[in-house]
Amino acid sequence: MSDNANAIDPNETTATRRQRGERIAAELSGDPNPALLATLDRDFPFLANALTSYAVGEVLARTVLDVRARQLALVAAFAALGFGNEFKIHGGYALNAGVTEDELKEIVYLITIPAGFPRAIQASQALAELLASRRAA
């Protein structure tokens, strides 16, 4: 499959991508107005626009991978990079998309190979926080 099979129309406006990004963010989070985007929009509108129009409205809008696979890939990447906050955000999205707690724990185990134990321990702590907050809700 070529990269162009899933490409976003280059003539599409940033506003169109942002609208799509806002819709996808709401679907992923299960919240029609995700708090992260609202805070960014208020305090750092340029970041909110970049995140919503490009990262979500373009990259996450692609359909070569389904939502579940895409979120597993992102969770693994964020865990390996040591980005605990992003791991928790996308871990929540992954759970919303049908990924199980055991699958997220397996990601933590798997990243010991490319990223080492310190990053896996960071990810395990982030996952424990995520799961505790979801159970408390």
Which residue ranges define each predicted feature?
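Acidic, glycine/proline-rich low-complexity segments that act as flexible tails and inter-domain linkers
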Residues: 1-67, 96, 121-137
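A general alpha-helix detector
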Residues: 24, 55, 72, 89-90, ...
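Short acidic alpha-helix initiation/capping motifs at coil-to-helix transition points
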Residues: 49-52, 81-88
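Short, structured motif recognition centered on aromatic/hydrophobic residues
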Residues: 70-78, 107-111
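A short structural micro-motif
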Residues: 79-80, 97, 110-117
